[in-house]
Amino acid sequence: MTRFLILSAVLAGPALAGDTSPAQLIAGYEAAAGAPADAERGRALFLSTQTGGKPDTPSCTTCHGADVTRAGQTRTGKEIAPLAPSATPDRFTDSARVEKWLGRNCNSVIGRDCTPGEKADLLAWLAAQ
């Protein structure tokens, strides 16, 4: 019985990682914001230079680059897979991972948590790339 439970947990792990889609995430953030996503606002936020966050990460493009279909690079030199789902199909399919990274990166770049509307806008733009 114990072996069965362990095997079930191991087999369920990968299925749980892909618990969502970009469209589902956007819909959830739109509902929380009470407004539809705007991809153009997401593009503008992604490409803009911010002043509220860390000085060494003034923009999303600092690490991800302006072309989100290409790999980016962390400040330590580690490669970051492309943000665009067209280049990285499993991007934005794990809701916990999306929340973790949006939380970390919004605070690093903007100096605060992104609002649900900003998250919807960013994902709407990224999903279209």
Curated annotation (Swiss-Prot):
Keywords: Disulfide bond, Electron transport, Heme, Iron, Metal-binding, Signal, Transport
GO molecular function, one term: metal ion binding
Transmembrane segment boundaries: none
Disulfide bridge partners, by residue number: C106-C114
Modified how: Binds 1 heme c group covalently per subunit.
Stored Pfam families: DUF1924 (PF09086)
Residues making up the signal peptide according to the UniProt record: 1-17
Binding site for heme c: C60, C63, H64
Biological role stated in the UniProt entry: High-spin cytochrome. Transiently bind oxygen during autoxidation, which occurs with a half-life of 3 minutes with a 4-fold excess of O(2). Also binds carbon monoxide, azide and cyanide.
Protein name as annotated: Cytochrome c-type protein SHP
Primary gene name: shp
